[in-house]
Amino acid sequence: MVQEEINKTLVEHSRFGNVVRLKGGDPFIFGRGGEEIIALIENNIDYEIVPGISSCYSAAEYCGIPVTHRGVATSFHVITGHEKVGNETVNYSALAKLSGTLVFLMGLSSAENISNKLIENGKSENTPVAVISSGTTPRQKCVTGTLTNLSALAKQMT
């Protein structure tokens, strides 16, 4: 279902009483929850948000990988790995300079581009990486390697 249909469904069903909209993870971290809130506000519909735990760190935790670690990574940065074609805005030059953990969400199909752009902008080819698919579910897969073989690791997930 496309987002516009989801928004319309929320508005239509709310006219009949309480509606619960369940989303995996945090609805405001690349979850399009903001768009749903706007649709509700525009239709004068009251709502309540109960945020979930975001996959931007929970998937790594399930693999035993901390996104921050004293002396290693004192910050983490969440980036979409799934930009609209022709509307790319990720600043790989700035990302390559960061010393914290880079978390790309929904980036399996873009892994080769992500790897190439980071390396082209100065990130070490030996930077450790993990590729996680279906995080925090019974189907979760996690493989690790380096930035050089990120694309090959991602292909193991498909």
What are these regions (language model features)?
Residues 1, 51-52, 107:
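Short beta->alpha connector loops at strand-helix junctions that form conserved
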Residues 1-11:
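A cross-family phosphate/adenosyl-ligand binding-site feature
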Residues 5, 15-20, 32, 38, ...:
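A contiguous loop/helix-start segment that scaffolds small-molecule binding in enzyme catalytic cores
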Residues 12-82:
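Short glycine-cluster motifs
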